[in-house]
Amino acid sequence: MTTISVIKVSGHELDDPTFLGGLTAALRGFQQPLVLVHGGGKEISAAVERAGLQIEFVDGLRVTSPAVMDIMQMVVCGTINKRIVTALVNAGVKAIGLSGLDLGLLRCEPYRPAGRDLGRVGEVTAVDGAALLHLLALGWMPVIAPVALGATDGLSYNVNADMVAEAVAGALAGAELVFVSNVPGVLVDGRVVPALTPAAVEELIANGVISGGMIPKVRAALAALQRGASSVRIVNLAGLHDGGTRFTHGELSE
């Protein structure tokens, strides 16, 4: 099998009503096997508000009570996932919508950063890579919503979509991970840096060249490398096929 690409799109991007059409057109042109991981976005918060429940975030992670989990699962698995799958199928792509609950695809433990209890927020501990490879061998594109199965309690958990994408790419040996963003890549002096190593990233952060909202993006890229991805790119839709900034383990050739 040729190189697998795991493509992650955020809920923020999906909040743009024009984004899905552009994404569908771009993915239709790919020749290699693809796995798509997506986030949630404003629709989850809107549904939580309509239910009269509190919206709370800690370091970008949604505090998820059992009631909020029910709503999150309904929106991200039932509405957003199926919207994406419908668009892809209508474009001729053999897409299949899944969450981490299906086939026990993603298993997790409660995520407790710095000891904080975020409720039903999980951290992926296992991915059924064999199941994904089987679906890919059939010529299908798995579209994965970021809900995982608790490894010890059997409950559903809300998982950060970046973490899901990192874990999936790591489970598919040699896979490339592509983070689709609203920027064309890491910019230095207004130009996209085509390639970076972990050492170069740390130097650019220390020097203040990489700052603000780009820092968590590059940190996620480095985390994906550590989890086993062969390479990682940060791109926008225009650069989805071969553009953006590529992160690799080793030294870059001159």
Curated annotation (Swiss-Prot):
Role, per record: Catalyzes the ATP-dependent phosphorylation of N-acetyl-L-glutamate.
A single GO cellular-component term from the record reads: cytoplasm
What residues bind substrate, as annotated?
Answer: G40, G41, R62, N158
Task: Report the pathway entry.
Answer: Amino-acid biosynthesis; L-arginine biosynthesis; N(2)-acetyl-L-ornithine from L-glutamate: step 2/4
The Swiss-Prot or TrEMBL record describes its family as follows:
Belongs to the acetylglutamate kinase family. ArgB subfamily.
Question: Which is one Pfam family of this protein?
Answer: AA_kinase
User: What is this protein's record name?
Assistant: Acetylglutamate kinase
List each coiled-coil range.
none
Query: What superkingdom does the record give?
Result: Bacteria
Q: Where in the cell is it found?
A: Cytoplasm
**InterPro entries documented for this protein:** AceGlu_kinase-like_sf (IPR036393), AcgluKinase_fam (IPR004662), ArgB (IPR037528), Asp/Glu/Uridylate_kinase (IPR001048)
Reaction(s) catalysed by this chain's protein: N-acetyl-L-glutamate + ATP = N-acetyl-L-glutamyl 5-phosphate + ADP
A single GO molecular function term of this UniProt record: acetylglutamate kinase activity
